[in-house]
Amino acid sequence: MQDQRNLLVFSGNANKPLAQSICKELGVRMGKALVTRFSDGEVQVEIEESVRRQEVFVIQPTCAPSAENLMELLVLIDALKRASAQSVTAVIPYFGYSRQDRRMRSSRVPITAKVAAKMICAMEADRVLTVDLHADQIQGFFDVPVDNVYASPLLLADIWRAYGTDNLIVVSPDVGGVVRARAVAKRLDDADLAIIDKRRPRANVATVMNIIGDVQGKTCVLVDDLVDTAGTLCAAAAALKQRGALKVVAYITHPVLSGPAVDNINNSQLDELVVTDTIPLSEAARTCAKIRQLSVAELLAETIRRIAFGESVSSLYVD
């Protein structure tokens, strides 16, 4: 193994188990830092070891509670920069606020993904590493290099192992996800592709799900970047089963799973939901028989190693 004495990994409180798994994959210990709260709730951070001239990686998804976790990340970066770290890479497995990435129809709303990116850059982070951004263009909101790595190799390997490619069809849950679904289908021996076209015929009429493609008697694999309340996902599963699908499974990178998500999944016709550990699961999600979690620790550890030693990251994804 290459010399990793100048590589340090720190973590906020958002996803300590993932950070520990990454350290184990890298063969390094977790950096010593106090990340807690003052009595009034303000974030308190103290780096408890020297980081001078070290290559530092801070692992902190900005999942719920988003504001607190983002603030922890910002304060950690600032503390490390002030302690003379050679470079600080913000490792953000799930980049919260990413869905607020544009002004629809020029409405009077913020572009919060840009706000979060500017705040991270203002703390003088040297680089950002993230997984499956909601939109690739968000990389342009940052003034520093961004490595947006994809969980697809991990998810594809599991699809091959669990379901094979016989009688399988990849399904995009909406028109916007067609590019992602097509890429997955290509890697599954050019599997068939179906698209769910959601539309509301007129005001006060329920949304209709039109399925473009033949799913009769097939195992349907829905692919997407995140699942929130799972309402749309569960409705899609019901529509696919109604059209004769044999089985409906979903492979989704980020398990936001807010509100009634777990209940929705338990009561749905979805056979299995496979997610990653970019966001920690709640107790209800961990005990849900339909939810299975894969780890991105090995993927992120290898990417961190390549960044630290000046190797290509893009070659991880060359076909």
UniProtKB/Swiss-Prot annotation:
GO cellular component, one term: ribose phosphate diphosphokinase complex
Cofactor note (record): Binds 2 Mg(2+) ions per subunit.
SMART domains: Pribosyltran_N (SM01400)
Gene giving rise to this polypeptide: prs
Annotated binding of Mg(2+) 1, by residue: 134
Cellular compartments annotated: Cytoplasm
Annotated binding of D-ribose 5-phosphate, by residue: 200, 224, 228-232
GO terms, biological process: 5-phosphoribose 1-diphosphate biosynthetic process; purine nucleotide biosynthetic process; ribonucleoside monophosphate biosynthetic process
Cofactor or coenzyme needed: Mg(2+)
SUPFAM superfamilies: PRTase-like
Reaction(s) this enzyme catalyzes, per UniProt: D-ribose 5-phosphate + ATP = 5-phospho-alpha-D-ribose 1-diphosphate + AMP + H(+)
Record: active site: 198
Keyword Nucleotidyltransferase: no
Family named by the database record: Belongs to the ribose-phosphate pyrophosphokinase family. Class I subfamily.
Pathway as given in its UniProt record: Metabolic intermediate biosynthesis; 5-phospho-alpha-D-ribose 1-diphosphate biosynthesis; 5-phospho-alpha-D-ribose 1-diphosphate from D-ribose 5-phosphate (route I): step 1/1
Gene3D superfamilies: 3.40.50.2020
Pfam families, per the entry: Pribosyl_synth, Pribosyltran_N
Major subcellular location class: cytoplasm
Record InterPro entries: PRib_PP_synth_CS, Pribosyltran_N, PRibTrfase_dom, PRTase-like, Rib-P_diPkinase, Rib-P_diPkinase_bac
EC number in record: 2.7.6.1
CDD domains for this protein: PRTases_typeI (cd06223)
Enzyme class, broadest EC rank: transferase
Protein's name in the database: Ribose-phosphate pyrophosphokinase
